[in-house]
């Protein structure tokens, strides 16, 4: 997963974000269309999306609330990473850190997306799914992102596979936000390629989850050893 420099990025987008064209207000439309492509084709180009947010900073009359929320949702799918916060910091203070009296639709949306992202970054996966299901607004905010829930599940599974050799089935089911054992088993076996044995999910050994014996070695040269002996002799004298 490379959300910073994806292979799907076309040359004309690369020319915009790497050249002076990134300051041209007319480039906003091109970058917006490219964001739509990302949402439909399930890839993410955070670099290009930040270029669009920077254009919005310079040209506030061009701001589109739906584009901002789509950028944040796409950045969220890159967890754990700083991508969401990097995008958030390009919004105005009233949007990214609204006060208690803020009531605009965008500030409310940003606040809710921040909460979701914090739960993913904190590995509070079961809580994330509960929050996502708690308000219809979340469905509205993610509706443009094709396969959003599946992308989150796959990413959670990748992180689990890097950390565990086995995990309790009910725990993983809650982390994946799946509500029945049949769907969970299908995801585990077909998408992840793991095995279910009773209430335990067996995860194959890989470079990340393999237990390694820690080897601690200290090289002590003759001079260091001599100083220790001398100090011990002086203290006992």
UniProtKB/Swiss-Prot annotation:
The keyword Cytoplasm applies. GO terms for biological process: formation of cytoplasmic translation initiation complex; regulation of translational initiation. Keywords: Cytoplasm, Initiation factor, Protein biosynthesis. InterPro entries: ARM-type_fold (IPR016024), CSN8_PSD8_EIF3K (IPR033464), eIF3k (IPR009374), PCI_dom (IPR000717), Transl_init_fac_sub12_N_euk (IPR016020), WH-like_DNA-bd_sf (IPR036388), WH_DNA-bd_sf (IPR036390). The keyword Cytoplasm applies. Residues 44-219 form the PCI domain. One of its GO terms (cellular component) is eukaryotic 43S preinitiation complex. One of its GO terms (molecular function) is RNA binding. Its main location: cytoplasm. It is found in: Cytoplasm. Component of the eukaryotic translation initiation factor 3 (eIF-3) complex, which is involved in protein synthesis of a specialized repertoire of mRNAs and, together with other initiation factors, stimulates binding of mRNA and methionyl-tRNAi to the 40S ribosome. The eIF-3 complex specifically targets and initiates translation of a subset of mRNAs involved in cell proliferation. HAMAP family: eIF3k (MF_03010). Component of the eukaryotic translation initiation factor 3 (eIF-3) complex. Belongs to the eIF-3 subunit K family. This is Eukaryotic translation initiation factor 3 subunit K. It comes from Neurospora crassa (strain ATCC 24698 / 74-OR23-1A / CBS 708.71 / DSM 1257 / FGSC 987).
């Amino acid at each position: 997963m490379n959300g910073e420099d994806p292979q799907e990025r076309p040359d004309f987008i690369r020319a915009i974000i790497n050249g002076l064209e990134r300051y041209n207000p007319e480039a906003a439309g091109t970058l917006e269309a490219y964001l739509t492509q990302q949402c439909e084709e399930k890839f993410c180009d955070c670099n290009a999306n930040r270029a669009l947010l920077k254009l919005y900073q310079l040209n506030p009359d061009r701001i589109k609330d739906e584009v901002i929320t789509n950028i944040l949702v796409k950045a969220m799918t890159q967890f754990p990473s700083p991508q969401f916060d990097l995008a958030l910091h390009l919004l105005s203070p009233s949007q990214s850190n609204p006060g208690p009296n803020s009531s605009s639709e965008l500030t409310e949306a940003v606040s809710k997306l921040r909460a979701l992202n914090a739960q993913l970054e904190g590995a509070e996966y079961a809580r994330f799914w509960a929050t996502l299901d708690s308000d219809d607004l979340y469905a509205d905010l993610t509706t443009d992102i094709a396969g959003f829930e599946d992308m989150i599940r796959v990413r959670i599974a990748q992180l689990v596979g890097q950390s565990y050799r086995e995990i309790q089935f009910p725990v993983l089911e809650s982390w994946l936000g799946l509500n029945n054992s049949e769907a969970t088993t299908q995801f585990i076996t077909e998408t992840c390629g793991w095995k279910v044995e009773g209430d335990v999910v067996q995860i194959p050994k890989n470079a990340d989850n393999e237990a390694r014996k820690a080897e601690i070695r200290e090289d002590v040269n003759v001079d260091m050893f001599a100083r220790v002996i001398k100090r011990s002799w002086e203290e006992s004298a």
